[in-house]
Amino acid sequence: MSKMRVYEYAKKHNVSSKDVIHKLKEMNIDVSNHMTMIEADVVEQLDRSFSKEQKQELKKEEKKAPVKTPVLEQFEEDEDEVIQTKVPIKKAVVKNREGKKHDLQIQQKEKKIFNNKKNKKQKPQQAPQQEVQKKKEKELPKKITFEGSLTVAELAKKLGKEPSEIIKKLFMLGIIATINKDLDKDAIELICSDYGVEVEEKVTIDETEFETIEIVDNPEDLVERPPVVTIMGHVDHGKTTLLDSIRQTKVTEQEAGGITQHIGAYQVVVNGKKITFLDTPGHEAFTTMRARGAQVTDIVILVVAADDGVMPQTVEAINHAKAAKVPIIVAVNKIDKPTANPDRVMQELMEYELVPEEWGGDTIYCKLSALTGEGIDNLLEMILLVSEMEELKANPNRRATGTVIEAKLDKGRGPVATLLVQSGTLRVGDPIVVGYTYGRVRAMTNDLGRRVKEAGPSTPVEITGLNEVPQAGDRFMVFEDEKKARQIGEARAQKQIVQQRSVKARVSLDDLFEKIKQGEMKELNIIVKADVQGSVEALVAALQKIEVEGVRVKIIHSGVGAVTEYDIMLASASNAIVIGFNVRPDANAKRVAEAEKVDIRLHRIIYKVIEEIEAAMKGMLDPEYEEKVIGQAEVRQTFKVSKVGTIAGCYVTDGKITRDSSVRLIRQGIVVYEGQIDTLKRYKDDVKEVAQGYECGITIKNFNDIKEGDVIEAYVMQEVARK
């Protein structure tokens, strides 16, 4: 018998990898994970061990089988004996005519004895039932429940006592009460404790905030569910091609000549088990949904091109997956190319703690070609293996809850939403609340374009019947009736749930010390962006050394270049602070940061960053001047004039540029110079300010290296007191 891996043995003998690992550990054989290679002699030991267990189980079943039969046989034997005793008596009567009367008397006596025995058996059965009924009437309840308060009459009714008796007890406790007096929780508990009855107060749950309601299922009701997979990676590394290849090989082979319908997600069947793929490649959608509190992904496939290696977006994708605490499977794509070097990719990814199993790590690497289809079956098997180890389960036997994947307004069908059912079962006709809209599920379509009547956990379906279009990432919940769904949907709309999300409390340096004191924070998440890689490394190293009150700094992402919208979304999802060193946020990043209430700190000196973070963590931040950007202008043309210098012909794109404001020159997201405006002109006239949509000429004091395409940002310093 040859060597094999743990998961191969499990697959061959139709047992789970966890059972095999557990058995090996019982045999004192060191096993790290499901990819560990086991020797031939160990395989034989396993075979013997599993065969013994099977034999023991069979013996147990044989012993358990004949439990009730002896009682029945004994009962039948007793009946036979009774019949046999009667038969000879009848025969004796027939043979002996003279003693006929005597025999009849004997027979009647025997009947009476037999009937008496029957009555004796029946009477003890009836008597206890009557006694139990009497006892039940007198017995006090073990527990009573109430909501808010109870009157004396209501409490007496719950306890099965007279109100006068309760009033007497209250009087003995120093409480003068009438039959209609409302009793508080303490009084109810005192009376009930006197009777030895347990009290439970019902807490009213606000179902309008159903995202915060956590329903704990009975472990017996949980069943295995398909994993939900998201594909991430750098641009042009083959994410979309891989999705298309999986769909063509697995979905279209089920559909003979059928056209699949794009609903934002689809399912494939591998070895009789389903896998759900979110058809939204890239980490942007992933992070946007996570920022809204929707954690839908179970496994992330990180696609890296074998001929290109690790790129900036690859690193971003790794950081996003780690921040969400989702297992990563690395798909090394384009191995069919002559320049492919998978080993180089593995080596580069080791820097980001993605160590291959072949090299002693715990990250699964799959070499494949999305174009030719090579290695795709192996990738799908690995997804099922990781899913098995993660023990993904859900309860299908309750009202459905889940998340919106996509939503749109269709001309013919009205609002259409793609929902991913995460728990329970969604059925046609269910009253549903989605985000801040509501409706009844009118029709359901699966990813193959077929009408379905119900959808279980991890199943994506497209539904119609909502009154408005929800947002991607919104949570949904099914309610018992349409009236309640309408009430909750309208209440949520009135609370303007969308605006409340944007006002979500974020961590900032201003309130950092308070959160540390209250024990709310154990780690301070930070995103670092700088102008050059050397600055990034120096800043990260310096920040990681900071530790105050047991709170450590955790760098969740770092990179070179301007602060982007995606950095802000990651900070929003991870409750992080963004630090920009010698770089500026672009216009979109500023807008998103303001909406998501993300704290951005911009610096040009490293020790100032360290000082500010340490001071914030110690609660020693002084009042400071806050920078307020008042406008931006784009340099369209430059003019060199002797004795004046370089004049920048600008177009004001945002806000306004004022004569007395400070300015900074930004080139490709990097700050080149900071200073003051020397002259500000419109045509030939000096002006105090130029508003958005107008052209102007600007010169900067002591600086002439202005180029076309540069951005001039105007700002003023305002003094603000810290709270």
Swiss-Prot record:
GTP binds at residues 233-240, 279-283, 333-336. Residues 112-138 are annotated as: Disordered. Residues 114-123 have a biased composition (Basic residues). Residues 333-336 are annotated as: G4. It is found in: Cytoplasm. One of its GO terms (molecular function) is GTPase activity. Residues 224-393 form the tr-type G domain. Keywords: Cytoplasm, GTP-binding, Initiation factor, Nucleotide-binding, Protein biosynthesis. GO terms for cellular component: cytosol. SUPFAM superfamilies: Initiation factor IF2/eIF5b, domain 3, P-loop containing nucleoside triphosphate hydrolases, Translation proteins. Pfam families: EF-G_D2, GTP_EFTU, IF-2, IF2_N. Residues 258-262 are annotated as: G2. InterPro entries: EF-G-like_DII, IF2_II, IF2_N, P-loop_NTPase, Small_GTP-bd, T_Tr_GTP-bd_dom, TF_IF2_bacterial-like, TIF_IF2. Residues 279-282 are annotated as: G3. One of the essential components for the initiation of protein synthesis. Protects formylmethionyl-tRNA from spontaneous hydrolysis and promotes its binding to the 30S ribosomal subunits. Also involved in the hydrolysis of GTP during the formation of the 70S ribosomal complex. This is Translation initiation factor IF-2. It comes from Anoxybacillus flavithermus (strain DSM 21510 / WK1).
